[in-house]
Amino acid sequence: MAAEALLSSLLGLLFLGLLLPAHLTGGVGSLNLEELSEMRYGIQILPLPVMGGQSQASDVVVVSSKYKQRYECRLPAGAIHFQREREEETPAYQGPGIPELLSPMRDAPCLLKTKDWWTYEFCYGRHIQQYHMEDSEIKGDVLYLGYYQSAFNWDDETAKASKQHRLKRYHSQTYGNGSKCDLNGKPREAEVRFLCDEGAGISGDYIDRVDEPFSCSYVLSIRTSRLCPHPLLRPPASAAPQAILCHPALQPDEYMAYLQRQAESKQHEEKVTEEVQDTDHQVWSGSKAAGAPPKKEDVSPTKEDKESEFWKMLQEPEEQATGTEEAQAGEQDLNHEAAADPAPAPPTDFQNNVQVKLIRSPADLIRLIEELKGAEKGKPSVRQEQPGDDTTEAPQREAEAKGKGGEPRGLVEEEDGDEEEEDEDEDEQQLLGEFEKELEGMLLPSDRERLRSEVKAGMERELENIIQETEKELDPEGLRKESEREQAILALTSTLDKLIKRLQESQSPELVQKYKKRRVVPQKPPPSPHPTEEEPEHRVRVRVTKLRHGGPNQDLTVLEMNRENPQLKQIEGLVTEVLEREGLTAEGKIEIKIVRPGAEGKEEDTRWLTDEDTRNLKEIFFNILVQGAEEANKERQRQSELESNYRRVWGSPGGEDTGDLDEFDF
């Protein structure tokens, strides 16, 4: 809005300059209203001054701002040659004339338009009526705005001289001798203007607007696609605004002082640049001379240090690997039964860091827990002594069990089982924590998953073997019952599942997320909770409401358009088309208010939006969704530069000033 106000004010000054004497303006100009109706202009106030009075061209005009700053503005070349080009334009059209193009409207239905209280009815070539409607019925008198009298003749020489219709690109008809006007006592009259609208081919002809410039004198604008084939009525191609360039006009002494200041400023910049370059060269030369000798002296020690570190790094892994292989060999000798067992061996990637123990009895489980406790308290010797303990403690416990001859064997096993259950509840967390810490420090998520599956399968097989061996050793009636056997299996399986579940939950979320990203496993998309019948179409939802005064007290009521209304579907289609064409998604909420008077009657009897409103919505959506932010940014920057240049006042040498910001108002 500020740019438009500035443009109009400067154009006013520009046109006043056209009327000034020739010795002030440097040329003679004339105000061409036809040019203003056809062309668009954009004012540009440049910061580069010129010497005033030097240009004698006819396309230069001198104007003055409110701050008394004079400008020389040069009209664009298109404005100079506008009149000649328009006269030389000869459209090569061999089709039907304008009356023939509009003749089908005679047999078409009359056009209706409701504006405020009144409804207007236009019947081509017959008459124009005005009346009030309530509940689809005419209430009160019917006024005639006029009967058909004549149409504009495009071949008449007098009509050609006016060029009004040619410039505004419309065809007109005259309607007169209507109902008597109560204000001036004259019969009502109207002018009907037909304009090309290519979009009207789908919705049909329509009354765009009804104006009353004078009392009982009306102008109806009708949009139709029937006139678009004619070159004289087809809308011209939109072009960029013609720029009017305005330079500050200085007196000769002011201009010479300006040139001198520019030369001094340029010399100062060159001098500063040379000083900076000299300083950089000196600093670079000094640093290069000082840094060269140390580099030569340090070359050989650095290489020797790097080589020694490299050989140390190679020797350390070999020593570690040798120690690990020896430990593994000793463990395999002591646990030959475990090697012969069909349980799966751990992956080869973990043979240097992971030790796998087979738990074949509750006593082995207790010993493993004690070893882990000792490792936590800072006793690394527990793990080294483990193979020996395995061989010595097992016979001792068996001897103690056999020594108790007064008790049955089944009772001894039950008492041992109770003690083991109590110890298991206390030490389960400790065992699981140590196991998880070692896995987190040594394994990647993918390796953990593989190791976990193999350990789980091996433990399940070992549990099954333990149950089978126990059945053989115990009394035939001990666990032969199916119920007892199932209970034992469930107890062992639940413990195993609990350990595996806790292990899965304790994984680092970040590592799990990275592991999931690396895996390329196709997953089915989750089903939508509320499937729609046509998902792409229902991505965009448009809601149209209308405010209307009604009832005896003229209360304000709110009406909402029905979802089945075809006009609502058309609006949703326009929004979807804009979004798909620009590659945007329907996110967020946009509210657009169209302020217009509502019509009386029920919802189904009234039209919510005119055809023009529906067509304009597409442009509104495009401006909001696509061009809004970028264009607003550019316009804001251009406006700021324009105002800054306009406020600058060029005075005596060194005395430039700016206008008062409080007085300057766009």
Curated annotation (Swiss-Prot):
One Gene Ontology cellular component = Hrd1p ubiquitin ligase complex
Q: Which residues are glycosylated?
A: N177
Ranges for domain MRH come to 108-230
List the InterPro entries.
Answer: Man6P_isomerase_rcpt-bd_dom_sf, MRH_dom, OS-9-like, OS9-like_dom
Biased composition regions of type Acidic residues, renumbered to the chain: 413-429, 657-666
Q: Which domain of life does this protein belong to?
A: Eukaryota
The record's annotation in PROSITE patterns points to: MRH (PS51914)
Q: What would be one Pfam family of this protein?
A: PRKCSH
Question: Which protein family is named in the record?
Answer: Belongs to the OS-9 family.
Its quaternary organisation is:
Component of the HRD1 complex, which comprises at least SYNV1/HRD1, DERL1/2, FAM8A1, HERPUD1/HERP, OS9, SEL1L and UBE2J1. FAM8A1 is stabilized by interaction with SYNV1, which prevents its proteasomal degradation. OS9 and UBE2J1 recruitment to the complex may be mediated by SEL1L. Through this complex, may interact with ERLEC1 and HSPA5. Interacts (via C-terminus) with CPNE6 (via second C2 domain); this interaction occurs in a calcium-dependent manner in vitro. Interacts with CREB3.
Question: What is this protein called in UniProt?
Answer: Protein OS-9
Native organism is Rattus norvegicus
